[in-house]
Amino acid sequence: QSYSAALMTAVSLPSFFNAIPHANGYEQISSGDTNMFRLAKEQGYETYFYSAQAENEMAILNLIGKKWIDHLIQPTQLGYGNGDNMPDEKLLPLFDKINLQQGKHFIVLHQRGSHVPYGALLQPQDKVFGEANIVDKYDNTIHKTDQMIQTVFEQLQKQPDGNWLFAYTSDHGQYVRQDTYNQGTVQPDSYLVPLVLYSPDKAVQQAANQAF
C-alpha cells in the first residue's frame, strides 16, 4: 500500500510521471528534468502510452510528457468518440503487438479501472459479484483489474531473458460505502493505493524493495 500523488487524475498523473516529491511542483514538471518518459528515452528505451481514458479528458498529456512519448494511442485512434472511454481490455491487443524481445521498452497501459459509474464498461460476464448495490458494482471493477494485471504479468513471464520490471499502481483511490461513494475527498481510501513492483531479476527486485 502506498500514497497517491494527488486525489484527482489531473494532478496525480503529471506529479507521478515527473517524480514530484511535494506540492507546487509545476516548475519541475515544466522543466521535464525528472520526466519518466524523457529519462527512459535517454537510456535508449522506446516509450509507449496507451490510454483507455477519453481523449477530451486527457488535456494533461503535455504535463505527463507527450513530447517524449514515441507511441501514443487513445480511444479515438480505435474508433471511439472524442468523449468516449473504452474498456481496459482493449489495451491488451496493443500490448501484445509490441515485440518485447527487440530493443528496450517503457510501456504505460493507462486504465480506467474503478471509475464511476462503476461497471459501465464491463461485459455481463465480468459482473461476478452482481449489481445489487454500489459495493458489488465497485468490486466487479476490481476483479476485472485483477484479471488484466494477470494477463499482462503472464505475457511478461513468457519473455525468455527475464529482463523486465512490472509495476502497478493507481493515480488515486475511491471512497466506497453502501450509502456514499466518491473520490477527491480527504478520506484515506481516496489516497491509499496499491503498489506492485516485480522483476524476475533478483538484483532489480532487491533495488525495488530497498527503494519502496
Predicted regions and their residues:
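Active-site-proximal alpha/beta segments of enzymes that process anionic O-linked groups
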Residues: Q1-D126
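A short beta-strand-to-alpha-helix junction
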Residues: E27-T34, A132-K144, T185-Y191, A203-F212
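Short beta-strand segments
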Residues: F49-S51, F106-G113, D139, T145, ...
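A long, amphipathic alpha-helix that forms part
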Residues: E89-L100, D126-F166, R177
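Flexible, surface-exposed loop regions and adjacent strand-edge segments
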Residues: P124-V128, G184-V186
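Histidine-centered active-site microenvironments of extracellular/periplasmic hydrolases
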Residues: D161-W164, Y168-V204
